[in-house]
Amino acid sequence: MALSLAQNCVPSAFNPLVYGTEIKSLESHLVTNYSASVPEAYRYTSPSVELQNATFCNITVTYTHPGQNDSIVAEAWLPTEWNERFLAVGGGGWVAGRFFLSYNAMQGALADGYATITTDAGLGSSVEPSQWAQTSPGNVNLYNLQNLGSVSLNEQAIIGKSLIKSFYGQAPKYSYWNGCSQGGRQGLMLAQRYPTAFDGIAAGAPAINWNKLFTFIQWPQQVMNELGQWPFMCELDAITLAAVSACDELDGVIDGIVSDVKQCLGTFDPFSVVGESTTCAQLNGTRKIITSAAATVLNATWHGREDYHGILPGADLTGNSPRSFGQPGIAATDCTEKGCAGTPSNLGTSWLKLFVAKHATLDMAKLTREEFDSLAYSGTQQYASMIETSDADLRAFKAAGGKMVTFHGLADNIIPPGGTEDYYNAVADVDPEVREFYRYFEAPGLGHCFGGASGSPTGLLHQLRDWVENGTAPEKTPIKITVGNATHDRILCPYPQTSVFDQDCGDASKAGCWSCSGGVSVANRAKRSAQRWNEL
């Protein structure tokens, strides 16, 4: 079987036609003795795995939409030892796919026997969009943005299924999607706009409400610019640690994790630590007094803009603390003994400058609040239908038999979890039987897609597959958390339920001492924060 499949790995064996496209080139070659170590961090919903001596057909399809001057590359890996299933993977940040995170996910898929595919949406692998955002100064390349937003995703599914049928002589029995962040947004877009593309979708920390999200990512920097003060990162880190210390035991267990983020957001006052001192790495280890400006920036970031949620207490905001785990901070500053300047994320600045204002040299540091708010509104006006993925009507996905699971870390330091909660609630408003096809898991302590005191929900993809193929919906999912130097077993529960520790059981390190509590209806739910930040 493997030998005959290997003989099929020639360009002439494939003809992946997609209506409205034209194939520019198709290359294939057989890869043998391929091995890789894949960490769980890059798989999101599956455990770490060792890929050993795999043999697969690597197929690269380059195509265009005639008249649009684009060039999209889809890359598929078809293993000779196949489980008769298809797993497509997503991208991250500004990248649709075909970069290191996608390739790690594909390596993991191969190890589990899946045929797998990724696409670059015609954008290449650059982590920032300046190379493709505009056709000329002031003119956005709407075709490229459309390809990133939606079009290439459906084509990725069609091409993948066509290649699979040509190679194996049969279509996949089941098709799945797995992604986080940009990949999570892509998963939601597939469920909303292409409801028959995949049987099961795992969409972690999705970048829903794209314009509001990317505007919010710039929000802490805007607050600092308006204040005319850019706090030392050690000040923000110290307030974050104070919040963790104050809110840790709200769930009845002291473990360094803020689980009851809503109560923490409503009760902990960041201004309560103003005037205290903290050791500051940006000042070569000397002490720094925590300023009111630092508390103001952090408070604004926690509560979010008037129309959008904020990052929650416990999440790293600087990328400089032990809680960052190498992830960037949206409230980062660059400091010397003379003072600090803001260091904004290119996610927010690139979006607002290149796409919304269409002005690559716009000085973001000089925007007034009125100008900033105007940009935010304009972005939604221009691009909501193209990339937002906020459509809550998933009835076509449900009717097609689709199942979806979403997770979001409550210590996510880039994408506010409140947006994912709001989306699930909105879906429930359209279809009160949402649990029949869609479940959402909040993960206390988990950072953006991975990292943090909590591990990733590594059983979720297997549970999704069991739901699709056997009708067994996930009632909980296992995770591991780090407490000091020890690893504890816990569970996550489908929203709106939460995991609760049984004090009589006595051992918080055992998953059996935790259970899901609360009703399953999202009716009469409380908003995550009653406050939105309107004034400095």
For the regions a protein language model found, what residue spans apply to each?
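Gly/Ala-rich beta-loop-alpha elbow adjacent to hydrolase catalytic centers
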Residues: 178-183, 187, 412
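A catalytic-pocket lid/entrance helix-loop region that shapes and gates access to the active site
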Residues: 189-191, 196-306
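Conserved alpha/beta-hydrolase "acid-adjacent" motif
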Residues: 414-418
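Secondary-structure transition/capping motifs at alpha-helix termini
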Residues: 80-83, 112, 165-173, 194-200, ...
